[in-house]
Curated annotation (Swiss-Prot):
<protein>
    <recommendedName>
        <fullName>Zinc finger CCCH domain-containing protein 44</fullName>
    </recommendedName>
</protein>
<dbReference type="InterPro" id="IPR045877">
    <property type="entry name" value="ZFP36-like"/>
</dbReference>
<feature type="region of interest" description="Disordered">
    <location>
        <begin position="1"/>
        <end position="31"/>
    </location>
</feature>
<keyword id="KW-0677">Repeat</keyword>
<keyword id="KW-0863">Zinc-finger</keyword>
<feature type="zinc finger region" description="C3H1-type 3">
    <location>
        <begin position="259"/>
        <end position="286"/>
    </location>
</feature>
<dbReference type="Pfam" id="PF00013">
    <property type="entry name" value="KH_1"/>
</dbReference>
<dbReference type="InterPro" id="IPR036612">
    <property type="entry name" value="KH_dom_type_1_sf"/>
</dbReference>
<feature type="zinc finger region" description="C3H1-type 2">
    <location>
        <begin position="98"/>
        <end position="126"/>
    </location>
</feature>
<feature type="zinc finger region" description="C3H1-type 1">
    <location>
        <begin position="32"/>
        <end position="60"/>
    </location>
</feature>
<dbReference type="InterPro" id="IPR036855">
    <property type="entry name" value="Znf_CCCH_sf"/>
</dbReference>
<dbReference type="GO" id="GO:0008270">
    <property type="term" value="F:zinc ion binding"/>
</dbReference>
<keyword id="KW-0694">RNA-binding</keyword>
<feature type="domain" description="KH">
    <location>
        <begin position="166"/>
        <end position="230"/>
    </location>
</feature>
<dbReference type="GO" id="GO:0003677">
    <property type="term" value="F:DNA binding"/>
</dbReference>
<dbReference type="InterPro" id="IPR004088">
    <property type="entry name" value="KH_dom_type_1"/>
</dbReference>
<dbReference type="Pfam" id="PF00642">
    <property type="entry name" value="zf-CCCH"/>
</dbReference>
């Protein structure tokens, strides 16, 4: 009986000690293993346990230090104070730490990393262990600039203010021609303004009292048209000859020394004469006159 009792007592005590030893070992593993880096976390597959993992996910020195320690069997290193272990995460996903401790598995692929400089994973070994928020200033070959300069206007774009711009022109003529250019009651100047749309005025010449200035104002096309009509009018008034000694008789007098209607109007034959009956050139053979005899 005593022997049997002794046999039963021994295994019971042994089993109790074994259970206590296993429980103590389990608790020590759960606490002490946090001093070693997790090999799964620093691999491309990642750690499936996340924050419940018994190994360290935030190792000083990042991937290189962890790989060197695990390959050479280094001693356990205490976790730095103030840092929380990383939770589960996948590359290109939301951050779980303020330090880049994992390599981005999209960076060296053909498609590249879509997050660019904002990626929370290291784009190269030089970024391991660096703060994420301070990494945005680094140039990134795969990322695009967050801000782009506005496109500059092309050379073909013309400012709206240049359309229909107003201009002025000045023609200096002999003062004796001013009356003929104006016409009776201003008929000639009014006709030119009505036909071209340009404003016409005759003023004194500042430097020569024997000259008059014909000032034109309007668009470039209006001034061009009005200038041509004024030139044509001057030619008709002067008759392509020096002014007569007695200008008071007028070019329409038809007396000796007058060239009125002595030449055919070139614009009338083209159908473009704008002076009509007031033209100083003949509109057809019926109006043509013989030039006066030379004195």
């Amino acid at each position: 009986m005593e022997a049997g009792g002794g046999k039963r007592a021994a295994p019971e005590g042994t089993n109790g000690a074994a259970k206590r030893a296993r429980a103590s070992e389990s608790s020590q593993v759960g606490v002490g293993s946090k001093l070693k880096p997790c090999t799964k976390f620093f691999s491309t597959s990642g750690c499936p346990f996340g924050s419940s993992c018994h190994f360290l996910h935030n190792f000083p020195g990042g991937y290189q230090a962890a790989a060197k320690m695990t390959s050479h069997g280094g001693t356990a290193v205490a976790a730095p104070p103030g840092r929380m272990p990383l939770g589960p995460g996948a590359p290109n996903g939301p951050p779980t730490s303020s330090v880049k401790t994992r390599m981005c598995n999209k960076y060296n692929t053909a498609e590249g990393c879509k997050w660019g400089s904002k990626c929370h994973f290291a784009h190269g070994e030089r970024e391991l262990g660096k703060p994420m928020l301070l990494d945005n200033s680094m140039p990134h070959p795969m990322g695009s600039m967050p801000f782009e300069a506005p496109p500059m206007p092309g050379p073909d774009i013309v400012p709206p203010s240049t359309f229909g711009a107003s201009a002025t022109a000045k023609i200096s003529v002999d003062a004796s021609l001013a009356g003929g250019i104006i016409g009776k009651g201003g008929t000639n100047t009014k006709h030119i303004s009505r036909m071209t749309g340009a404003k016409l005025a005759i003023r004194d010449n500042e430097s020569n009292p024997n000259l008059k200035n014909i000032e034109l104002e309007g668009t470039f096309d209006q001034i061009k048209h009005a200038s041509a009509m004024v030139t044509e009018l001057i030619v008709r008034i002067s008759g392509n000859a020096p002014p007569a000694k007695n200008p008071g008789r007028g070019s329409h007098a038809g007396g000796p020394g007058s060239n009125f209607k002595t030449k055919l109007c070139e614009n009338f034959n083209k159908g473009s004469c704008t002076f009509g009956d007031r033209c100083h050139f003949a509109h057809g053979e019926s109006e043509l006159r013989k030039p006066p005899a030379a004195a």
